[in-house]
Regions:
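Alpha-helical transmembrane-bundle signature of multi-pass membrane transport and export proteins
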Residues: 1-438
Length: 438
């Protein structure tokens, strides 16, 4: 445990009046950040669909090439997340957001130019996709670290809830918008539309009036110094009980969920015999769930307390997935049951994410916000490929229904570190900040 404060000390507070918390929407700088991040999130979702379609439709790429392109775009989350955290903690975060937006806009605008001049090849997409992915990692980490500088402590949950709603809307609407753009304007032009959206984000964030203090000089400019800074972030996360519990919970969840997802997508057509249209309905139920969860996430801690909200939302989201293995056969009832499971998983899962993120930001000193966010991002994205392998091998070894059940049990086990930690006992007030060890 770190010296001084364990960030989740339990206090017996009375339920606060939620009306006493000023609306986050009255904060003009937050509104600009929300607008910019929303534009950036939509750009990322449009690009995530359009880049592979450029490979398929414009370059007639093979299935292996498309798979490699997808992996290359995601690879920076594993390779550069920890180092991105160091940079975010040593540079003004608003500047990073603007620079990564402009950088991704420039990178993506190269795609249609190369296509129109008959110079575009799959190798170009690999290179451009990788650097665009690096920009996304930096933007994500900087965005999480920047929010606590713009809003009051009591507004963090509402702010994260609003940003979570944008993430949900982009997840639902971004691919659909990207599909329409590809259909009407071709895939390379759809990529250009993503670049324009990044420009909108950069301009909006540039108008934020909040002035950040000059970052503290650091030894991180040298390779050895950078590694020491990375280690300091890892030590802070795993050396403090509440942050360690969050990270362990996230790693168990992501490992199990990725394995479950691999099995579930095979379970529906092969075991239940669902048609592509029925599978689409089941997966579409996630969208409304995301929006409902994000809409209510900001209010739940004021009504039920932070610890109870975290434990309850995580319990419902994870335990409901045990119901998948009980579904037999196709037909309306099976589809409706799976839609309900996905809806509940999405709504309670988003509410849990918002609450956990708000507490993590509150516990973390400003000088470590980037590295703590990056460590969590590294764990979440880094363990997913292992989960996919486990899901595939289990499905082949013990069958899809058994795999769905086993991985859902694994998902439920993510509740254990949360339930045993001091996080579950946090009442209505956000916990005090953990003091950084010298």
């Amino acid at each position: 445990m770190s010296e001084a404060t364990s960030g989740a000390q339990v206090q017996e507070e009375q339920e606060p009046d939620s009306a006493a918390v000023p609306s986050v929407w009255k904060n003009r700088d937050f509104t600009k950040l929300w607008t910019g991040q929303t534009a950036s999130l939509f750009a990322a979702q449009i690009t995530e669909l359009a880049l592979p379609l450029v490979a398929v439709l414009a370059l007639t790429a093979t299935s292996q090439q498309v798979g490699l392109l997808t992996s290359v775009v995601k690879l920076p989350y594993l390779l550069v997340s920890l180092f991105a955290g160091v940079l975010v903690d040593r540079v003004r975060r608003r500047n990073i957001l603007i620079a990564t937006d402009l950088g991704r806009a420039l990178i993506l605008s190269v795609v249609p130019v190369l296509y129109w001049t008959d110079q575009l090849g799959i190798s170009w997409l690999y290179v451009l996709g990788f650097f665009a992915g690096c920009g996304s990692v930096l933007f994500d980490v900087a965005g999480q670290a920047y929010l606590p500088r713009l809003v009051e402590r009591d507004q963090l949950t509402r702010g994260n809830s609003a940003l979570g709603a944008s993430q949900s809307a982009a997840t639902i609407g971004g691919p659909a918008l990207g599909g329409v753009l590809v259909q009407w304007l071709t895939a390379p032009v759809a990529v250009l539309a993503g670049a324009v959206s990044y420009l909108v984000s950069a301009v909006t964030i540039w108008t934020i009036g909040h002035k950040e203090d000059r970052p503290t000089p650091s030894e991180a400019a040298s390779p050895a110094g950078t590694l020491r800074e990375v280690w300091a972030g890892l030590r802070f996360v795993f050396g403090n009980e509440p942050l360690r519990a969050m990270t362990i919970m996230a790693s168990i969840f992501n490992l199990s969920f990725t394995a479950l997802e691999v099995a579930f997508l095979q379970f529906m057509p092969r075991t239940l015999g669902l048609s592509p249209g029925e599978i689409g309905l089941v997966m579409a139920a996630l969208g409304p769930g995301f929006l409902v969860g994000a809409a209510f996430a900001g209010r739940l801690p004021q009504r039920f307390g932070y610890g109870r909200t975290m434990l309850t939302t995580a319990s419902v989201a994870n335990l409901v997935m045990l119901g998948i293995s009980t579904v037999h056969g196709g037909g309306f009832l099976s589809v409706a049951t799976l839609m309900l499971i996905n809806f509940l998983f999405a709504s309670f899962g988003v509410a849990n994410n918002v609450t956990v993120l708000s507490i993590r930001q509150t516990l973390t000193p400003d000088s470590l916000q980037g590295r703590v966010a990056a460590t969590n991002r590294f764990v979440a994205m880094g363990i997913a490929p292992l989960g996919a392998l486990i899901g595939g091998f289990l499905g082949a070894g013990v069958g899809l229904r058994s795999t769905v059940l086993i991985t859902a049990i694994g998902l439920s086990s993510a509740l254990v570190p949360l339930a045993l930690s001091s996080l579950a006992r946090i009442k209505y007030e956000l916990p005090p900040q953990i003091q950084e060890r010298p």
